[in-house]
From Swiss-Prot:
GO cellular component: cytoplasm; nucleus
Recorded metabolic or biological pathway in which this protein acts: Amino-acid biosynthesis; L-methionine biosynthesis via salvage pathway; L-methionine from S-methyl-5-thio-alpha-D-ribose 1-phosphate: step 1/6
Name of this protein: Methylthioribose-1-phosphate isomerase
Active site (catalytic residues): 246
Highest rank taxon of the organism: Eukaryota
């Protein structure tokens, strides 16, 4: 059984405070939009899919427990709440796409004859709940598509060795995970020999969260420092690198956790395939290249301090971007719930049939 980043029933939302992991597992209530935005901004919950899910569910909870009295006030509240949630962490596109889709859905429902605040509230809540269910289904498909694709490149009985970065598992999504979902699927098939996970400085999502998930599920794994990636790829016969994404744009350029770009360069040098695993909700086809992606910058103390104890020299300047952009030329394939695409095939692959 996978870990849960969120626990939801209608009118009630709890998020696993990931700042306390791996030492303490504690779920905290989210009673409304402001608490949802705070949980996202402070990284109690993180991962592009999970951010969107917590965002829309926090809205659903507040609408359920504190319903609006008329249609105009409901529309205004939803629009302003979604804007606030999007601004909490702007690089991840999932929350922005969910906000745009929900605003459009609500406007369409409000134009129907007989629309009332009660009916519209029910529609919004159901929409938010459907996002939770769909994310788990999409992640399982990503895992299975990715595992199948990687195994097709291997021998018929060969086990594969993977390397991954940051945290892209159940803790970053509604369940199962994206890049870590691929690892899970390989393990379930009995075809995973080992996975290496990077510590992912400065927030240590790899050592705190990914390692926690891998130990929890008894998947054979080894934690490495970020600076060990080169020697690991060379010495440990890594089959492929698989990472997640906070935003993939039309040409395949990918924004992901800081350090992803250098992993792609190292993989290219060693002739190792480099895959991005992401749901279509993380793909922003409105941006032609990664140069337009807004990169969030985090506070300096996240780099200079650990658990409130300063480890860096006082007075040193700090640059702490949360993400970097990997050029599409370094990416072998993008694994989505609709299949695996080369970067240049992504836009057509995701728009076909729409």
């Amino acid at each position: 059984m996978s870990l849960e980043s969120v626990r939801y029933s209608r009118g009630s939302l709890q998020v696993l405070n990931q700042l306390l992991l791996p030492h303490k597992s504690e779920y905290e209530p989210v009673t409304g939009v402001q608490q949802g935005a705070d949980a996202i901004r402070t990284m109690k919950v993180r991962g592009a899919p999970a951010i969107a899910i917590v965002g829309v569910l926090s809205l659903a909870v507040e609408l359920t427990t504190k319903p609006c009295q008329d249609v105009p006030s409901l529309i205004t509240f939803v629009r302003e709440s979604l804007h606030h949630l999007v601004s909490a962490r702007p690089t991840a596109v999932n929350m922005k796409k969910a906000a745009d889709e929900l605003n459009a859905f609500l406007a369409e429902e409000a134009d129907k004859p007989g629309a009332t605040s009660q009916r519209l509230t029910e529609s919004v809540v159901q929409w938010a709940e459907s996002l939770l269910k769909k994310d788990v289904e999409d992640n399982q498909m990503i895992g299975d598509f990715g595992a199948k694709h990687i195994l097709e490149k291997a021998g018929p009985t060969e086990k594969v060795c993977m390397l991954t970065h940051c945290n892209t598992g159940s803790l970053a999504t509604a369940g199962y995970g994206t890049a870590l979902g691929v690892v899970r699927s390989l393990h379930a098939l009995g075809r995973l020999s080992h996975v290496f996970c990077t510590e992912t400085r400065p927030y240590n999502q790899g050592s705190r969260l990914t390692a926690y998930e891998l130990v929890y599920e008894k998947i054979p794994a080894t934690l490495i420092t970020d600076s060990m990636a080169s020697v690991t790829m060379r010495e440990r016969k890594v089959t492929a690198v698989v990472v997640g994404a906070d935003r993939v744009v039309a040409n395949g350029d990918t924004a992901n956790k800081i350090g992803t770009y250098q992993l792609a360069i190292i993989a290219k040098y060693h002739g190792i395939p480099f895959y991005v695993a992401a749901p279509s909700t993380s793909c922003d086809l409105s941006l032609p290249t990664g140069g337009s992606i807004v990169i969030e910058e985090r506070p300096s103390h996240e780099l200079t301090d650990i658990n409130g104890i300063r480890i860096a020299a006082p007075g040193i300047d700090v640059w702490n971007p949360a993400f970097d952009v990997t050029p599409h030329e370094l990416i072998t394939g993008i694994i989505t719930e609709r299949g695996v695409f080369k970067p240049e095939e992504l836009k057509d692959g995701l728009t076909k049939g729409q």
